[in-house]
Each structure stands twice: as structure tokens, then as C-alpha cells.
């Protein structure tokens, strides 16, 4: 599929809130004598395409022939967008084009300064007329809504009605709690928070996810209903609920991930790719984007490289792992074991452990450690083979091998937020529990154990 898509150049039109993302990179190494605040020394500035313009950049990077339609102010940011995007922009005098200045220090965002006008545009009729004039030449339309006043109910309804009459798919990245202005679109891509606000649900856990995503499809007459679930992937409701699991290995910055998702979906639908396959590809694109800093675009070459990346990269030593963990403010879950012959019970256990936090680390006993604990005939599989099997599961973020009989030293070194063990430790002391504030015991699936599997194999011989 990637080979086919990388050779296509579909014409895609984008309407929405085109913005400028500015990054001011600073060095913050001292406190001001005037007040208890950081002193930031500017090192460099980096101006990028943001909002709908970032969707444009993603589509262009994928190889699409992209055209932008929008309204900007008569200011520097509006001029920057006109100079860097192919399209047509109506100029509304006195309007501030959205400009977001992110102050960055040591790869962390410490402050954001916004300049914008979020009132509804005065040029609705002119924008609709411009769309009507251009639309017939395109294979897909994207509405990128950041609630900055461009995509008014009148504009959205007119665009969707016209595109639908021409059988052109309309994909919407929505904003706000009222999705009625998007009724009749091909699909929406709300994240979990946006979906909850629109549905007035308390949560989207368990059965609520299927109820909610189906309700969105029915209430707003969508062809497909989608909810992006961050680290859990993308939920799709067509004839039933399906979830495309997330693919990210390391997350540095989620800025622009949603833009990449809708760009890939639009590119795929413009080329008549089956929707679930499109969602899987969108997940892979998002994984590439969140591994970078800032609003960035993604290409098919990067996705291809990501897909070919070996899961062996998830196997780290403790020093490498600590460095990675320090770069992210994530809830760390730790569990450990021999995992000699991985079975269904292990899979369910690790899947449940992952749900407790953001990053799941599995401490794996080395071959020497297993031999001391289990006897000379073990392990059946080498430590590298066992580590690779664990790393192949999407819900395992990292595997670290330790040589000691217990993971105490490793737990002390990594300092995870949550320590997880099986429910059989209910009346036992969990190693490392004195170092960690939260310990969770998870029930095992009955009837599954490595020892039983080994005995069963021996009996058959």
C-alpha cells in the first residue's frame, strides 16, 4: 500500500484556521534578581506552519497537490502564510492572523504567547463562493477547525453540502462541543476530550466507547465515525467498532499529531483506500510525528522507515532507559519476570499493566538469573529471544534485562511510579514495594503457566 500511495498525487483542498507556529529557543540557566522567575536567553527563532497550515504541510510532504482556502489578516503572519502556501486567501483588514509563540528551553515548552482574533469572519459569503468555484477539481476536502472563527456554521454547512453533491469526501478535524455544523461529513476526527464534550458522556471506557462512537455516526450522519485515543490508538466505527492500536515507541511532543492523522486519512480516502487500513497508516504517521519536537510534517519515506524499524529498539539497558524517562513527564509502570515461554496469561497480564500508566517497562531476568531461580534446564528461550518477544507487543514500551535474582536494584535505579505484580503476591512482600508509593496486584488468567506448558510438551514426547 505504501508503494502505491507514494506514487499518487491527489488534489486535496483545505479550508480552516491557518496559523503560524513560532518557536523561540532559549537557554534558561539562572533566576532573575528582580523576581523568582527564570531568565531566558534567546538562542534562535523558528517559524513554522501551524493549524490548518500544518495539515497542508503534511499533505504536501506525503506528495499531494494541496490547495489552501482561508481568511487571514493584513499582518506579518498573514503574509507569511500567503508566501508559503499555494492557495487563495481573502484578506480581512484589522484581523489578527493566529500566531502562537512557544518559548522552549532544554527541549521543553515553558510558555506560549498567543496573538489571535477568534471572532467569526466577516467574509463568509466570499469564502463560500471561492470554494464553489474551486471544488470540482479536487479528490478530497479537509476542514481543519481550531475555533478561530473561519469555519462558521454557515461555511461548514455550505462546504459539506456542495462536496457531498459532487461525491467528494469531506474530513473534519472538529473543535468545540457542538458538532452539528459538521453534519453530513464523511468523517470527523475528534480526540477523546472533544468527543466527551460533544457526547456529554462522563467517560469513554468499556461499552461507553462503542455507544459513543456509534452515537456520533448516527447523530451527525457520518459515513465513518472516528475517535483518536492518544496512546491507545484510533477507534473506528463503520459496521462495528474496531481499534487500530497506537504505534509510538518514544513520545517527545504531541503537537501536530492530530494534523498528521487527518492528513493521512484524507490522502488515503482521496485514493479510495479502505478506511481501517487508512487508520492504521494514520497511527504510524502520528508515531513518527510525536517522536519529534514541534509541529512537523511526515512523509511516506519516514513512515516506511518507522515500519521497518526493529522492535529490538525497545530493548534498553538501564542507563539508556533512565535518560529516555527523564525527557518525558510520564507515569511509569514497572513489572518483571522470566517470561520464558510467553503465553496468553502473560499477554493479558501485561496488557492490564499498561493500562495503569503511560509507559510500561518490563524487567526481564537474564539467562543466568533464570538458571539460578528455575534450575539448569531453564530458560527454554535465551534472554535476547525472550526480550524480542516481549518487545514485539505494542503495549510493552521497553524491556530491560537484569542479572540479579530480584529487580530491587533496577527498581531503585529507575524509580517507576507504579510497581505491578501478580495477584499471587497478595500475602507476600513485593520486592521494591518499600521504594514505590503505589503497588498494584493483577489477577492472572487461570490455567496458564510456563511450567504447565513445558510439562505438556514433555508428556507428548
UniProtKB/Swiss-Prot annotation:
Keywords: ATP-binding, Carbohydrate metabolism, Kinase, Multifunctional enzyme, Nucleotide-binding, Nucleotidyltransferase, Transferase. Its EC number is 2.7.1.167, 2.7.7.70. It catalyses: D-glycero-beta-D-manno-heptose 7-phosphate + ATP = D-glycero-beta-D-manno-heptose 1,7-bisphosphate + ADP + H(+); D-glycero-beta-D-manno-heptose 1-phosphate + ATP + H(+) = ADP-D-glycero-beta-D-manno-heptose + diphosphate. Residues 1-312 are annotated as: Ribokinase. The active site is at residue 259. InterPro entries: Bifunc_HldE, Cyt_trans-like, PfkB_dom, RfaE_dom_I, RfaE_dom_II, Ribokinase-like, Rossmann-like_a/b/a_fold. Residues 334-461 are annotated as: Cytidylyltransferase. Pathway: Nucleotide-sugar biosynthesis; ADP-L-glycero-beta-D-manno-heptose biosynthesis; ADP-L-glycero-beta-D-manno-heptose from D-glycero-beta-D-manno-heptose 7-phosphate: step 1/4; Nucleotide-sugar biosynthesis; ADP-L-glycero-beta-D-manno-heptose biosynthesis; ADP-L-glycero-beta-D-manno-heptose from D-glycero-beta-D-manno-heptose 7-phosphate: step 3/4. One of its GO terms (molecular function) is heptose 7-phosphate kinase activity. GO terms for biological process: ADP-L-glycero-beta-D-manno-heptose biosynthetic process. Catalyzes the ADP transfer from ATP to D-glycero-beta-D-manno-heptose 1-phosphate, yielding ADP-D-glycero-beta-D-manno-heptose. Homodimer. This is Bifunctional protein HldE. It comes from Campylobacter jejuni (strain RM1221).
